[in-house]
């Protein structure tokens, strides 16, 4: 029909009525006048799964959009959004027929049309048809009837992204069931986007510190920083500020929105501290985001300013010691992803624990910023354990190990102004690398410590944008910059530009109302308990959960007592967690530190405390008190060497096999490293990603609270491809416990079926087979059970028939893959099953 212009069906009917082929009503004329023009081909689109031996699929077509254009013909039956494909008839949805002047034109037109089709809710054979159209044998016109049998590459099918449907399903779930992250918490009243500063996106990008690093290399760059008169500023808003104030809950979407503004309006910043610490696992565990994607996207938006992370030495970005080869691999992958400055620290200032991580950083060509964690009080003559000499010796040792910059990590805000002045002045005389001062404003006075340090040539200081500063976060960046204007240490940062960026953060913070920590007043009690800023609000939240909020002063006192019991140690993740766990444990059980040493009492200490005292986190100066070791570790031999030395090297190949199982593709090195760091967290994240796709681009109000009817937003899923999502309404609950959530997607009606967890379904969902369990026999296709050939207790042999399924006029026999015994049969003849339903259990 397409190449001759003759309506064959109509002509057949007319011939059947008795007309001769030459009849004028047929319009065929003489045979010689019938000519063919061009080429035509037909693709039959069916609900068959080519990845599962073309097993038919059935169900509801959630969305249907067809192709069109010149030379395109569609012959469809029940192909439309909402159509139900049942298992009792043919699986064909639509016949796509195209024509072109050349065979190659017809192929290209067919491919274009197949790619334009959007069919969601049921599997189709479109991926297979595209493989055929792309194959050289087909393009050359040399196919035979054995083509498919002899060409297994046709079944190397691309994974369909299906991004819009997955995102709508996630949004529907939040609308119907809420987001567990914010349940029971305060609701944010802000829905509109935070305002962005004005800048010219087409203007040349100003030069920044990263440009200077690439020009000079890390060693010369370090000297260049030291030679500058200005005080460099690192902005911690992207990481430590929200880690301290909002439990690390800021999302990539909000960080990315403001990133380019930083590159254009604040190029004189030393760095953006935006990765590492708790962000790595929190992004996957709670925000369902890929931490590597956050790094890559911010790097793309900010190519001119240094990006900085916090690296917990042999703990990497975790809470335990990892094998040395995992630490090295993580550092390399991070540097390759675009990270410039690694702030390396050990929770006990134990130099041997820092060496592997520092060496790994030095090998990458990135900046190694080695840290000394500040504790005690160097101006208090009664506190002699951590005196000035102690810190000077540490600094010299780190410089000798190759550090490019020395960080003073004052994680609790203990370094008083005069102490900062003395420490920095002395270190400047003793070492030859720049000094970077990090502190928390828990005591409310730490801006003075920075300014006192600036008087004696402090090189770099950490601060946070005004709305994200103060309390357990860092000092106020905006006022710091203003206070140094018109002095010889002025920062070079533009105050008005910073104020525009500040307005963005002020509004963005309103999105995170559910995570606002209780504002605890700044008190001098900090100098007694020495609790790190990143722990202070978290421990208070834990105390609240245990019903100890009204005993907070007691918790702080016991925390200080626990520190002294353990020998007065450096307290930062993970050692601070162990001290906090012990303090809460004692207060909750109405015990004191005296009870810890009372051998007549049987105490089950928290695991973190046992690990700390047992040496799994390293060794403090002078070690732990012997009586504490004996009481807490008991019969277990404590570790005195570096924990990483006793850990066997991680088997990357074996880990890759495990990752491949749940990713269902070959994993990258980066994915294997992530799995080795957080196996369960990463596996759960991948499962969420498979179900809902990339949710990091959803605006924060809708991610946490869902949309209200009529609310609309746009999200870019790739360059040049934007989804405009409008929520309409939710249906009443269905008998199976689902609700239908109705949307408009790019102006077209779409819906998502979501389980309402508050409803009791009339019929329980069927048990699903564990496809990794050889004892589970699952359905390979949706259909009806025609016959069951076994019963519980039967001894079966390999190849024996177990049952028969039927769908769309096709019967499939399920045979045993090995000798076994039937334990349980979950189906019966006449029962409808879905793909993956558990049918038979073996042993």
Which residues make up each language-model segment?
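ATP-dependent carboxylate activation and anion-phosphoryl transfer catalytic cores
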Residues: 1-183
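Terminal or standalone catalytic/regulatory effector modules within metabolic enzymes
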Residues: 114-119, 147, 151-158, 163-219, ...
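Alpha/beta enzyme core
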Residues: 252-272, 287-306, 316-433, 451-458
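Long, charged amphipathic helices and adjacent flexible linkers at domain junctions
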Residues: 25-37, 152, 210, 215-218, ...
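Structured functional modules or segments
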Residues: 769-843
